[in-house]
Protein backbone atom coordinates (compact mmCIF):
# COMPACT_ATOMS: atom_id res chain seq x y z
CA UNK A 1 0.00 0.00 0.00
CA UNK A 2 1.27 3.44 -0.91
CA UNK A 3 0.65 6.62 1.05
CA UNK A 4 0.48 9.92 -0.83
CA UNK A 5 0.03 13.20 1.07
CA UNK A 6 -1.08 11.14 4.10
CA UNK A 7 -3.78 9.32 2.10
CA UNK A 8 -3.69 5.53 1.62
CA UNK A 9 -3.81 4.81 -2.12
CA UNK A 10 -4.51 1.38 -3.62
CA UNK A 11 -5.60 -0.04 -6.96
CA UNK A 12 -7.74 -2.69 -5.27
CA UNK A 13 -11.35 -2.43 -4.06
CA UNK A 14 -10.37 -2.94 -0.42
CA UNK A 15 -7.38 -2.42 1.85
CA UNK A 16 -6.33 -5.53 3.79
CA UNK A 17 -6.80 -4.99 7.52
CA UNK A 18 -9.19 -2.05 7.02
CA UNK A 19 -12.90 -1.71 6.42
CA UNK A 20 -14.61 1.02 4.46
CA UNK A 21 -17.01 2.93 6.69
CA UNK A 22 -17.95 5.78 4.35
CA UNK A 23 -17.69 6.60 0.66
CA UNK A 24 -16.94 10.27 0.01
CA UNK A 25 -17.06 10.29 -3.80
CA UNK A 26 -14.68 10.36 -6.74
CA UNK A 27 -11.23 11.76 -6.04
CA UNK A 28 -9.45 13.07 -9.09
CA UNK A 29 -6.30 14.85 -10.06
CA UNK A 30 -4.90 15.75 -13.42
CA UNK A 31 -2.05 17.53 -15.10
CA UNK A 32 -1.35 18.60 -18.65
CA UNK A 33 2.36 18.54 -19.26
CA UNK A 34 4.37 19.73 -22.25
CA UNK A 35 7.93 18.95 -23.17
CA UNK A 36 10.46 21.69 -23.66
CA UNK A 37 12.52 22.22 -26.78
CA UNK A 38 15.58 20.44 -25.34
CA UNK A 39 13.58 17.28 -24.67
CA UNK A 40 12.00 17.47 -28.11
CA UNK A 41 15.37 17.72 -29.85
CA UNK A 42 16.71 14.73 -27.91
CA UNK A 43 13.51 12.80 -28.62
CA UNK A 44 13.82 13.42 -32.37
CA UNK A 45 17.41 12.20 -32.32
CA UNK A 46 16.47 9.07 -30.34
CA UNK A 47 13.51 8.46 -32.64
CA UNK A 48 15.83 8.33 -35.64
CA UNK A 49 18.02 5.75 -33.89
CA UNK A 50 15.12 3.86 -32.30
CA UNK A 51 14.60 2.69 -28.74
CA UNK A 52 13.25 4.29 -25.60
CA UNK A 53 12.77 8.04 -25.56
CA UNK A 54 13.96 8.58 -21.99
CA UNK A 55 13.06 12.28 -21.98
CA UNK A 56 9.40 11.46 -22.56
CA UNK A 57 9.49 8.50 -20.15
CA UNK A 58 10.75 10.84 -17.43
CA UNK A 59 8.17 13.50 -18.29
CA UNK A 60 5.30 10.99 -18.09
CA UNK A 61 6.59 9.53 -14.79
CA UNK A 62 6.67 13.04 -13.30
CA UNK A 63 3.17 13.73 -14.61
CA UNK A 64 1.80 10.48 -13.10
CA UNK A 65 3.27 11.33 -9.69
CA UNK A 66 1.80 14.84 -9.79
CA UNK A 67 -1.63 13.57 -10.89
CA UNK A 68 -1.54 11.05 -8.02
CA UNK A 69 -0.57 13.79 -5.55
CA UNK A 70 -3.39 16.05 -6.75
CA UNK A 71 -5.87 13.17 -6.47
CA UNK A 72 -4.77 12.54 -2.87
CA UNK A 73 -5.17 16.23 -2.04
CA UNK A 74 -8.68 16.17 -3.53
CA UNK A 75 -9.49 13.10 -1.41
CA UNK A 76 -8.39 15.05 1.69
CA UNK A 77 -10.70 17.91 0.69
CA UNK A 78 -13.54 15.38 0.48
CA UNK A 79 -12.77 14.21 4.03
CA UNK A 80 -11.33 10.82 3.05
CA UNK A 81 -8.32 9.03 4.48
CA UNK A 82 -7.92 6.57 1.59
CA UNK A 83 -8.57 6.14 -2.13
CA UNK A 84 -9.44 2.71 -3.52
CA UNK A 85 -9.72 1.51 -7.14
CA UNK A 86 -7.11 4.04 -8.30
CA UNK A 87 -6.71 4.26 -12.07
CA UNK A 88 -4.78 6.40 -14.53
CA UNK A 89 -5.86 7.74 -17.90
CA UNK A 90 -3.69 9.51 -20.45
CA UNK A 91 -4.39 11.40 -23.63
CA UNK A 92 -2.57 13.56 -26.13
CA UNK A 93 -3.71 17.15 -26.03
CA UNK A 94 -1.39 18.38 -28.76
CA UNK A 95 2.03 17.88 -30.21
CA UNK A 96 4.36 17.02 -27.29
CA UNK A 97 1.57 17.77 -24.80
CA UNK A 98 -0.04 15.03 -22.72
CA UNK A 99 -2.71 14.88 -20.04
CA UNK A 100 -2.39 12.42 -17.18
CA UNK A 101 -5.42 11.90 -14.97
CA UNK A 102 -5.58 9.87 -11.75
CA UNK A 103 -8.91 8.93 -10.20
CA UNK A 104 -10.43 6.59 -7.64
CA UNK A 105 -13.05 6.28 -4.93
CA UNK A 106 -12.37 8.46 -1.89
CA UNK A 107 -13.29 6.59 1.28
CA UNK A 108 -12.97 6.66 5.04
CA UNK A 109 -11.45 3.46 6.37
CA UNK A 110 -10.98 2.12 9.89
CA UNK A 111 -8.57 -0.52 11.08
CA UNK A 112 -10.32 -3.86 11.57
CA UNK A 113 -10.35 -5.24 15.09
UniProtKB/Swiss-Prot annotation:
It comes from the Archaea. InterPro entries: UPF0145_dom_sf, UPF0145_YbjQ-like. SUPFAM superfamilies: YbjQ-like. Belongs to the UPF0145 family. NCBIfam families: PRK03732.1. PANTHER family: UPF0145 PROTEIN SCO3412 (PTHR34068:SF2), UPF0145 PROTEIN YBJQ (PTHR34068). This is UPF0145 protein TK1926.
Amino acid sequence: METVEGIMVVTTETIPGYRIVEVKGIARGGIVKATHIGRDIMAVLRNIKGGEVREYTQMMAEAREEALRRMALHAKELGANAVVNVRFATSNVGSSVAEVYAYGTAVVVEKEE
